[in-house]
């Protein structure tokens, strides 16, 4: 194990000089430095560049407070390695695998895996066409998720990405069991804390590993924490042959941290100030999130859209890797429709008659046609009013508004805020409900009865309570 000395500290960037003739650490190797002689505080650095003349430039995974020139740095000889396997379930830890849930740390002999790995080879991959039921009507009907697929939840600030992810964790864990890995990348610590206690109360935590590198962490930790979560998911997939759910909130923060690191390393910025290696970094992460013949990883990734601009390089680069996209729209939140999923902008590779079946496909496409026609008629309605529409279009507008409201539902995880119990709606009931609305069976019921309900029976009961 070779050792060097700190030559320079500039924020999270630390230059380490090794003696001439010593073996230099490889790129991505973890280096360890202790801030005092008692070794009470350890800081891990990751090698990013070799500057020549025995000097390497590293990125710190923790705050560099207390580091001084001349401190000894040890090369561990391998990348950052984190605990994997059943010991991680029910635990909360950071990018380095150190526990942060105030419980006993992992044992020294716990199995560990390096966070930097190659993606599975082409012949190891598996293609699945099985639908993953979420219990959320708008998703299951119009943009269904594939088991072993990649899903992106796109949306600007405050439109409900994290709440939707929390509801998906709740529904999938309660209804399907299985193992989940939640990775918090550069998001609010408060949300992570809420999620942890919620999972603890519901018992879901026993089948979940949680990894956090939140907003207050240095860019190195925020950039690498997604790889830590992914490494744990890969172990369950490859060694234990499990079907794993990997939740990442938020992929944009991974890109943002990469941009900070790139600037700190002195690289020339690319479009909109992002790192020139944006597509490569995203590809290296996304290509590892896949399903093999041994097991599957279904990933659900929240993706922040800066200023609601979908052409921004960060969300645009992520788009290319996804099977399903769920787009959250601010206009729908203003109308009080939650989840604020845009039924026309969201899409899925799984929405085909071969995968979801003829009836589901026919109902979904007809729902989209009705909503699209309603969108086209909105300008006419705004200028001339409803009276100028043909009888056929008036009927269509009424059904479109009922469909739009029926796409909303109460969430279990939001019950403490709304006071309304959440609902889980099986796919078959979702398809039946929308089919009956399209057939005109509920044209006589008020539009308000369709807002924030579960299955179609709830609409009838709500209308009855309203006196219809």
From Swiss-Prot:
**SMART domains in the cross-refs:** AAA
**Keywords assigned:** ATP synthesis, ATP-binding, Cell membrane, CF(1), Hydrogen ion transport, Ion transport, Membrane, Nucleotide-binding, Translocase, Transport
User: Per the record, what are the reactions this protein catalyses?
Assistant: ATP + H2O + 4 H(+)(in) = ADP + phosphate + 5 H(+)(out)
**Gene Ontology cellular component list:** plasma membrane; proton-transporting ATP synthase complex
Where does this protein reside within or beyond the cell? Cell membrane
Q: Which residues bind ATP?
A: 155-162
EC annotation from Swiss-Prot or TrEMBL = 7.1.2.2
Just give the chief location class.
membrane
Q: Which GO terms describe its molecular function?
A: ATP binding; ATP hydrolysis activity; proton-transporting ATP synthase activity, rotational mechanism
Q: How does it sit in the membrane?
A: Peripheral membrane protein
Return the InterPro entries for the record. Answer: AAA+_ATPase, ATP-synt_VA_C, ATP_synth_F1_bsu, ATPase_a/bsu_AS, ATPase_alpha/beta_chains, ATPase_F1/V1/A1_a/bsu_N, ATPase_F1/V1/A1_a/bsu_N_sf, ATPase_F1/V1/A1_a/bsu_nucl-bd
Uppermost EC category: translocase
HAMAP family hit by this protein: ATP_synth_beta_bact
Q: Which NCBIfam families match?
A: atpD
Q: Which family does it belong to?
A: Belongs to the ATPase alpha/beta chains family.
Briefly, what is this protein's role? Produces ATP from ADP in the presence of a proton gradient across the membrane. The catalytic sites are hosted primarily by the beta subunits.
Q: Subunit structure of this entry? A: F-type ATPases have 2 components, CF(1) - the catalytic core - and CF(0) - the membrane proton channel. CF(1) has five subunits: alpha(3), beta(3), gamma(1), delta(1), epsilon(1). CF(0) has three main subunits: a(1), b(2) and c(9-12). The alpha and beta chains form an alternating ring which encloses part of the gamma chain. CF(1) is attached to CF(0) by a central stalk formed by the gamma and epsilon chains, while a peripheral stalk is formed by the delta and b chains.
In Swiss-Prot or TrEMBL terms, this protein is called: ATP synthase subunit beta
Tell me the name of the encoding gene. Answer: atpD
């Amino acid at each position: 194990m070779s050792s060097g000395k700190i030559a320079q500290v500039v924020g999270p960037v630390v230059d380490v000089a090794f003696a001439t003739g010593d073996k230099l650490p490889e790129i991505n190797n973890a280096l360890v430095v202790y801030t005092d002689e008692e070794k009470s505080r350890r800081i891990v650095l990751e090698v990013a560049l070799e500057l020549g003349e025995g000097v390497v430039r590293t990125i710190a995974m923790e705050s560099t407070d207390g580091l001084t020139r001349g401190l000894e740095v040890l090369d561990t000889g391998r990348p950052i390695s984190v605990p994997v396997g059943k010991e991680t379930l029910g635990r909360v830890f950071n990018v380095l695998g150190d526990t942060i849930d105030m419980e006993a740390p992992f044992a020294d002999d716990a199995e560990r895996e390096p966070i930097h790995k190659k993606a599975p080879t082409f012949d190891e991959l598996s293609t699945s066409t099985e639908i993953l039921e979420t219990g959320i009507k708008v998703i299951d009907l119009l943009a269904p998720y594939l088991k072993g697929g990649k899903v992106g939840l796109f949306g600007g600030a405050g439109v409900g990405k994290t709440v939707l992810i929390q509801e998906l964790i709740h529904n999938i864990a309660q209804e399907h069991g299985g193992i989940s890995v939640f990775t918090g990348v550069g998001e609010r610590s408060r949300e992570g804390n809420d999620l942890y206690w919620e999972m603890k109360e519901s018992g879901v935590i026993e089948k979940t590993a949680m990894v956090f590198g939140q907003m207050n962490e240095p860019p190195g930790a925020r950039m690498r924490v997604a790889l830590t979560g992914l490494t744990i998911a890969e172990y369950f997939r490859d060694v234990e042959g499990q079907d794993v759910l990997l939740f990442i909130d938020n992929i944009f923060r991974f890109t943002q941290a990469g941009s900070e690191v790139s600037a700190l390393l002195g690289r020339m910025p690319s479009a909109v100030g992002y790192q020139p290696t944006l597509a490569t970094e995203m590809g290296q992460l996304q290509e590892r999130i896949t399903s093999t013949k041994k097991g599957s990883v279904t990933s659900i990734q929240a993706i922040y859209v800066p200023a609601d601009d979908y052409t921004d390089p960060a969300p645009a680069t992520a788009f290319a890797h996804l099977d399903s996209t769920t787009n959250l729209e601010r206009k729908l939140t203003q109308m009080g429709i939650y989840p604020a999923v845009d039924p026309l902008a969201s899409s899925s590779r799984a929405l085909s008659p071969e995968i979801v079946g003829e009836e589901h496909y026919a109902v979904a496409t007809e729902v989209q046609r009705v909503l699209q026609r309603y969108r086209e008629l909105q300008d006419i309605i705004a200028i001339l009013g409803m009276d100028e529409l043909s009888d056929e279009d008036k009927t269509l507008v009424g059904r479109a508004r009922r469909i739009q409201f029926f796409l909303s539902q109460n969430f279990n995880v939001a019950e403490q805020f709304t006071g309304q119990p959440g609902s889980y709606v099986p796919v078959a009931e979702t398809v039946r409900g929308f089919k009956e609305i399209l057939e005109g069976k509920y044209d006589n019921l008020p539009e308000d009865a369709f807002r924030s309900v579960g299955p179609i029976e709830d609409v009838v009961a709500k209308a009855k309570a309203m006196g219809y």
